[in-house]
């Protein structure tokens, strides 16, 4: 079986865009540093193409065996694809036991099928950092910080409860001291002065407004009746002769005499019509002609 069987075809669309972005993150300077480190440890030449030289997994297995002897029991020298994949899988298991974090490790297909060389490079850099942490002389990677454990006595831990952490704010400079929650009532007296809280309703809180300056005293709610007399003067309305402003005016043009929509309208005006007179018994009826009912003089 040839290795071409495992090669993927060209990527298109979104897959091609993702592949190009991953390729742009590949660092060729780091590749040269990793090449020198691996060749120096194993004593073997990788070749012109760095990833193709690591693709069979042989150099990788020998490399981890140099860092941690006995990590890979058997290294397959065969050119068969499954043997090469087995070497890569054994290398991944070995570096996991060595201490490399799982999220830093590449997958076998990332190297064997050339899908993500950037992740392969990141794994080798993480391996270099772990090797440097373990004391190996490596010029690549960053040494991981060691744990600095501290043990405190219970008395010290209890004392820490009296300290206000920075996350809780500060008790100096400008603060929200004296501020009340939104919607709560604020009084005009200060409890620090030792005065008792008033028991009547004479104290006006700041949230209720002020009793000086312009105010809404005397204002009524929309739709309520407004009287034209002032109750503060001791005047009381005892009759219905006082017309409120909301009822309109009794002077000028008005709607007096208007009827509700739909009611019948009379064609005569009672002011200009006489009261009809009916003939008495024995009186001639011609004197009471219908036209005599109107004042036509």
Swiss-Prot record:
InterPro entries: Calponin-like, Calponin/LIMCH1, Calponin_repeat, CH_dom, CH_dom_sf, SM22_calponin. SUPFAM superfamilies: Calponin-homology domain, CH-domain. One of its GO terms (biological process) is actin filament organization. The modification Phosphoserine is found at residue 175. Belongs to the calponin family. This is Calponin-1. The keyword Repeat applies. Residues 28-131 form the Calponin-homology (CH) domain. PANTHER family: CALPONIN. Calponin-like repeats lie at residues 164-189, 204-229, 243-268. CDD domains: CH_CNN1. It holds the Pfam family CH. Keywords: Actin-binding, Calmodulin-binding, Phosphoprotein, Repeat. Part of cGMP kinase signaling complex at least composed of ACTA2/alpha-actin, CNN1/calponin H1, PLN/phospholamban, PRKG1 and ITPR1. GO terms for molecular function: actin filament binding; calmodulin binding. GO terms for cellular component: actin cytoskeleton. Disulfide bonds: none annotated.
């Amino acid at each position: 079986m040839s290795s071409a069987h495992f090669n993927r075809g060209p990527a298109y669309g979104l897959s091609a865009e993702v592949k190009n972005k991953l390729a742009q993150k590949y660092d060729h300077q780091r590749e040269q540093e990793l090449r020198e480190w691996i060749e120096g440890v194993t004593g073997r030449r990788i070749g012109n193409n760095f990833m193709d030289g690591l693709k069979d997994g042989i150099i990788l297995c020998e490399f981890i065996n140099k860092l941690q002897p006995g990590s890979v029991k058997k290294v397959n020298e065969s050119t068969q694809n499954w043997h090469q994949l087995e070497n890569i899988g054994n290398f991944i298991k070995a570096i996991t036991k060595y201490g490399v974090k799982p999220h830093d490790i590449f997958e076998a297909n990332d190297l064997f099928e050339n899908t993500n060389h950037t992740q392969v490079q990141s794994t080798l850099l993480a391996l270099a950092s772990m090797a440097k942490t373990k004391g190996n002389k490596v010029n690549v990677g960053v040494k991981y910080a060691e744990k600095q454990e501290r043990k405190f006595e219970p008395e010290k831990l209890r004392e820490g409860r009296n300290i206000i952490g920075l996350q809780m704010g500060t008790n100096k400079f400008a603060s929200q001291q004296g501020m009340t929650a939104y919607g709560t009532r604020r009084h005009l007296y200060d409890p620090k002065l030792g005065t008792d809280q008033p028991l009547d309703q004479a104290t006006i809180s700041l949230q209720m407004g002020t009793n000086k300056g312009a105010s809404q005293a005397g204002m009524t709610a929309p739709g309520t009746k407004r009287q034209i007399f002032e109750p503060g003067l001791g005047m009381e309305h005892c009759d219905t002769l006082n017309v409120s402003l909301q009822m309109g005016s009794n002077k000028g043009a008005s709607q007096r005499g208007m009827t509700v929509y739909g009611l019948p309208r009379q064609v005569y005006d009672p002011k200009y019509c006489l009261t009809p007179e009916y003939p008495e018994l024995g009186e001639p009826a011609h004197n009471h002609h219908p036209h005599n009912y109107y004042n036509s003089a």
